[in-house]
Every structure is written in C-alpha cells, then in structure tokens.
Amino acid sequence: MNFDIEKLDSQMASDEKKLFFIQTYGCQMNEEDSEKLSGMLKRMGYENTENRDEASIIIFNTCCVRENAENKVFGNLGALKKQKEKNPDLVIGICGCMMQQKGMADDILKRFPYVNIIFGTHNSYKFPEYLNRVKTEGVQIKEIIDKETEIVEGIPIDRKSDIKGFVTIMYGCNNFCTYCIVPYVRGRERSRKPEDIVNEIKDMVTRGYKEVTLLGQNVNSYGKGLEENITFADLLRKVNEIEGLERIRFMTSHPKDLTLDVVYAIRDCDKVCEQIHLPVQSGSDRILKEMNRHYTKEQYITLAKKIRAEIPDVTFSTDIIVGFPGETEEDFSETLELAKEVRYDAAFTFIYSRRNHTPADKMENQIPDEIKHERFNRLVEIVNTGIAKGNKDAEGKIYEVLVEGYSKNDEAKLTGRTRNGRLVNFEGGEDLIGKLVNVKIIKANSFSLIGEVEK
C-alpha cells in the first residue's frame, strides 16, 4: 500500500507556533519510526525543536522491552501536566510498542487525561489524520490496531544524518523468545518487496547518503511471505550492486537463522561491512532452552568461528541477559566463558526485566535483584576487557573511516567508524565530513580509537 501524499499535503499546519518535539525510546526500529513521524510533520509545514517547552506538538515514541523505559515515559508524561495547563492547545501524542500492550492505552488516559492522541506500531502513518481531527474537532483519539497491517510504502522520512541512514527491510518477529514482548507488540514477520527497498536506497544515494543499515527484528528471516523467492543473502547482493552506495550494515541476526550463504555474501560483497550483531543472550544451554532460542552454546561458538574463518577482520557485537529466571551461578559462569571465548567488540548487557504476558514472567525462581546486579557487574568487566583488547590490537593499523561529523566529546576532532564498526576520533577539516578517508590508529581508548589521517 502506498502512502497518500496528496492527502497529507491537504493537512498543512495552521498553528502560529509550528514546532514539534519527538522523544524516542528503544531500538533502531523506533528511531526510524520517529524519523517518519518527523518527515510527515515537516511535510505539513512543522519544524523540529529540541526544546520541549516551546513545542506545540509533543510525541513520545515508546519502548516496552524493559520496565525502565516505561517508567521514563510515565515520568515525562507527568511532567507535561503544567505545560498543558499553561498551553491548552498543546497536542500530546503517545505511540510505539508500549501502547500495544493490553490495557496500557486506557491506563495512560486514566492517569494522564490530558493526552490527546494514542496510537500503536501498526498505524503511525495515520498520525497526520489524527492530528487534524484533534485540531478541527477537538476530540481525544485512541486507536490501537492489534493485528499487523499491510506495509505502507512512501511515507516521508526525515533522517537524522545526511550521510548514513536506517532502511527497514522487514517488520515483526515470529520467534517468541520467552522473555521478549516484541512479537506481541510488533506482530508477525512481514517483508518489504526487494524493489521497494532498492528504490529507497537508490533515492538516498541521489541525496548523498553513503551508508545504509538494513533493519529487522531478524533480518535472516527476510523473504518470508513474499511472492518472489528471495533470501536475505540475495537481498545483500542486490543492494551491493547499487551504484554510488559505499557501505551496507544490517541488524539484527538470530544465530539460528544465520546461514553460510549470508556469511559468504558478507565476504564477497565489497560494500557489506565486516560487522555482525549476533545476540547470544546466555551461554548456558539450559537457559537458552528456557529462553526458546533454538541453539546451544557450542553451536553459537562454532558459528562465530566459521564467520571468523571466512571474514578475518569481522567484529561481533551481542546482547546478553543477566538474571533470567532460574539462572544459577553455574549457568552464569557458562555465559562468562562464552564472552571470553568469542571476545565481543561491543555488547548490550541487560539485567532481566519481567514483561507482562510473556512466558518468562510466569516462571518460578525469579532471581533477586542483588544477585542480578552482582552478576551484571562481573559480566560488564569481562566484556569491557575484550573490547579494550580489540581496540588495543587496532593500534598502528590503517582503517578506512566514513567521516560522520564532529566528535560529541571533542568538537575539535572529527569522528567516524571503520568498516568493522570501531569509533575513531581524529583531527581534520570540515571538508572531510561525508567522505571515506584512511586513518592510522595511534592510540586505543577503552571504547574508541584516536587516529590521524593518512596523507
């Protein structure tokens, strides 16, 4: 289904104060959803502001993977009460995964009755319509669609960067890991047509983009449900042929579905970067089974070794959960051993967070918080040691770096990433931004590298 751009153009902003503010919680999928909300609003004549207090429209795009993200939303909603009283015309919208949970939207309206619009993950393209109704009819809107809908193509998008951007290739997840709420709030797997993906990337290239990150809850499932017989490896090869594109990244890969064909595509496609996000979650076979992950510790390690054999410069990042119900000290030790053996270059480590309506929430032997935190600290120490070693090994080597802009920590330096994802800061002129340059690494820090441009 194609987005109705003509209808959007008929809903131009009438506010004197045409400013909007979007707060995004959660993953890269949410970030891209927010970029589309921003794209629609800008098409309507609104402008973005980073100052929430001056906005006439405020949107919270929510996440429900962990309880902490939900608590932040509640806190920020409460803080808007005075702003709404001061400016009754302020439009407050809440969307995203958190809203898809049973009873959540009604709870929000009960606790924060000044919220104007609530919608979920399947109907964000209708936000301009909701906004128009609030402004013209003065109604309060709550529309949560429980079942996944047809993919909508052609939604205007306002990407944060002019150099690199996210491109969603599929939506939803069919895996139902016992700790995870994503399949319940994002729906079943649906793949975009390859021609739609390729055309979007070609359009980005004409606008000057050098790098794309292909997004999906499990990119290795790409192709399911399409009439055309196509796999994720096939898609990588198609995207690799796009003239003018310099780099291709992707996430996330489920270890059980990452085939050798994908590994060979990464190896053979010159634009696909040597970086793989491969969530392991645990190193214990018993816990992996309880999580419904469908692989063992040995299978995961074997896969990592096969990948390294084919792609020597590859770096791995991962997700690890600490304190899953029933996790013993022995189980946790298996996770530490795996982290040491694989040696990750980045890791997103999480303390297990109970999620309503997931099987793990009902499991016995929930781990006390003090044990979770103690194990978490031990894991972070192991992971950080591995990251520091990887960075130290980079000293003296020359890497191709895509210059993304000025460093957030040192505005006198430029920043960018190597093909395998390492963050490099170095001195250079503004004219280098957006270009690929060779940088020699002269110093390794804990989580970044210092380099100098090769003349």
UniProtKB/Swiss-Prot annotation:
Residues the record lists as binding [4Fe-4S] cluster 2: C173, C177, C180
Domain named Radical SAM core: residues: 159-389
A family per Pfam: Radical_SAM
Domain TRAM: 392-455
UniProt catalytic activity: N(6)-dimethylallyladenosine(37) in tRNA + (sulfur carrier)-SH + AH2 + 2 S-adenosyl-L-methionine = 2-methylsulfanyl-N(6)-dimethylallyladenosine(37) in tRNA + (sulfur carrier)-H + 5'-deoxyadenosine + L-methionine + A + S-adenosyl-L-homocysteine + 2 H(+)
UniProt KW Cell division keyword: no
Required cofactor names: [4Fe-4S] cluster
SMART domains in alphabetical order: Elp3
Classification via InterPro entries: Elp3/MiaA/NifB-like_rSAM, Methylthiotransferase, Methylthiotransferase_CS, Methylthiotransferase_N, Methylthiotransferase_N_sf, MiaB_methiolase, rSAM, rSAM_horseshoe
Keywords, comma-separated and alphabetical: 4Fe-4S, Cytoplasm, Iron, Iron-sulfur, Metal-binding, S-adenosyl-L-methionine, Transferase, tRNA processing
Cofactor note: Binds 2 [4Fe-4S] clusters. One cluster is coordinated with 3 cysteines and an exchangeable S-adenosyl-L-methionine.
A GO molecular function held by the record: metal ion binding
Gene3D superfamilies registered for this protein in UniProt: Methylthiotransferase, N-terminal domain (3.40.50.12160), tm_1862 like domain (3.80.30.20)
E.C. number(s) listed in UniProt: 2.8.4.3
Binding-site residues for [4Fe-4S] cluster 1, renumbered to this chain: C27, C63, C97
One GO CC annotation: cytosol
Stretches assigned to the MTTase N-terminal domain: 18-136
Localisation: Cytoplasm
Domain of life: Bacteria
Subunit structure: Monomer.
Similarity comment: Belongs to the methylthiotransferase family. MiaB subfamily.
Biological role: Catalyzes the methylthiolation of N6-(dimethylallyl)adenosine (i(6)A), leading to the formation of 2-methylthio-N6-(dimethylallyl)adenosine (ms(2)i(6)A) at position 37 in tRNAs that read codons beginning with uridine.
Name of this protein: tRNA-2-methylthio-N(6)-dimethylallyladenosine synthase
Organism: Clostridium beijerinckii (strain ATCC 51743 / NCIMB 8052) (Clostridium acetobutylicum)
